[in-house]
């Protein structure tokens, strides 16, 4: 589909990838060698780490806070001592903090991120919130998790999986490190399914967000990448198929705000 008269053009390199993958060759709408992508993504998040909350507010018009609350509510963390969760691409701690609080401060959450700048922000926030004793911070790659098989009761990832070059590898690793009976939850920007809202959100995303990002941070390019990466990410049904292919069962998803974001769930049974 292409749109004319100054509207967003979404053809070719701008089409979403399917259930067979392909994100490893795209940096936003730019075609890149798969060996380059991780470094390019790392550069983006080094730049935005200190203003990550502002970035999410721009991308979601502030709704990411509501969606994250809903994610943790659906997870329903156990309040029994010893319950463990792995939050991947969770550097600044938004999901992990919510999980610890929802568990009555019983849960132990490992926050894993490939980006040290993001983890640094998360540690500072955890100390200020008095949650540091419930948390562990690990700098590592989602495609090669440094944990034994069957290690965690839950695996969460919010607004991070679209930045992983090989999504299939990340999903396989998620399955591997979960205990039998463990839960996978992924919150990600997705395909807007409501007529009119999709066009409004496109205009906001492609026209306004990079400009506002430049005004606030002096960096328009990082925000352009983040917007473009959303448009490349698989549709809800295609991503659900990828989760099933990794071995998960009872896979389902919920749309938020007309599909601007979707929350996917799966179980290791």
Swiss-Prot record:
PROSITE patterns: SAM_MT_UBIE, UBIE_1, UBIE_2. InterPro entries: SAM-dependent_MTases_sf (IPR029063), UbiE/COQ5_MeTrFase (IPR004033), UbiE/COQ5_MeTrFase_CS (IPR023576). One of its GO terms (molecular function) is demethylmenaquinone methyltransferase activity. It comes from the Bacteria. GO terms for biological process: aerobic respiration; menaquinone biosynthetic process; methylation. SUPFAM superfamilies: S-adenosyl-L-methionine-dependent methyltransferases (SSF53335). Its EC number is 2.1.1.163, 2.1.1.201. Keywords: Menaquinone biosynthesis, Methyltransferase, S-adenosyl-L-methionine, Transferase, Ubiquinone biosynthesis. It catalyses: a 2-demethylmenaquinol + S-adenosyl-L-methionine = a menaquinol + S-adenosyl-L-homocysteine + H(+); a 2-methoxy-6-(all-trans-polyprenyl)benzene-1,4-diol + S-adenosyl-L-methionine = a 5-methoxy-2-methyl-3-(all-trans-polyprenyl)benzene-1,4-diol + S-adenosyl-L-homocysteine + H(+). S-adenosyl-L-methionine binds at residues 92, 113, 141-142. Pathway: Quinol/quinone metabolism; menaquinone biosynthesis; menaquinol from 1,4-dihydroxy-2-naphthoate: step 2/2; Cofactor biosynthesis; ubiquinone biosynthesis. It is an enzyme of class 2 (transferase). Methyltransferase required for the conversion of demethylmenaquinol (DMKH2) to menaquinol (MKH2) and the conversion of 2-polyprenyl-6-methoxy-1,4-benzoquinol (DDMQH2) to 2-polyprenyl-3-methyl-6-methoxy-1,4-benzoquinol (DMQH2). Belongs to the class I-like SAM-binding methyltransferase superfamily. MenG/UbiE family. This is Ubiquinone/menaquinone biosynthesis C-methyltransferase UbiE. It comes from Brucella abortus (strain 2308).
